Every structure is written in C-alpha cells, then in structure tokens.
Amino acid sequence: MAIFQGPHAYVSPGWYENHPAVPTWNYAVVHAHGRARMMDEAELHDLVIRLSDSYEAGREKPWRAAQLPGPFVNAMLQAITGFVIEVERLEGKFKLSQNRPAEVPRVIAALEAAGEAELAALMRNHPPPAKG
C-alpha cells in the first residue's frame, strides 16, 4: 500500500461558535492498494530523465541531466528509491469538518489565517452536502 497525503491541519475548538467542542484534525488522503515492485536502475534513470525533461520544458534555458557527469548522476540515483505499484484498489478519505457544516466557513477563515491555504481551498471547493 502507498499512502498519498494531501493537505492537513489541526483544527482548534476555539474556532467554533458552538460549544462544547474538542480539537480535531482535517485531512485528505488516498491509500493505493496493490502489488508493488522496486524499479531497477535503468527504469529509475529513465524516469528521472523524463520527469526532469518534462518540468524543464518551456523554460528559457532548460536544464538537462546530460550536462552532468555520469558518476555524479549514478551517485544521486543511489539516494532515490523508485517503485511501481499496480493499483488494485483506491481508498480516499476527506475529513473536512463535514460533521459541523455551520462551522465550516469559520474553520476555512481560521485555516487561511493560520497559513493553511491549501486545506482551506479544499474545504471551500468541497463543502458538506446540504441536509434535507
């Protein structure tokens, strides 16, 4: 299983208008279940080159791994572990204060004030479903 953690942050009960309340943690996460295998050296090298080329594309002076001495590249690759996972099942979970829909705007504002803009945006874009 591989875990992909999205934005997450502490939520203070002091942010709520309604009490009693306790602290909690809001988060977004995906668990990818499947068979994993380690990449061999050639696969890893190819992947790093393709990723670098992709991110460098369109730059005025794109950096190329070919500019580096082979021994340096090989030493850097030793510090990277590459794996491939054949995904059989994905499990995603969002805990975004859905149990307190009236408090969500206050939590979003407090998260933004605390510098947690990514989580605040996720909550704004995925509001709790309306009751009814």
List each language-model region with its residue ranges:
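Short, structured beta-strand-loop surface elements
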Residues: 1-47
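C-terminal edge-of-domain segments
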Residues: 38-132
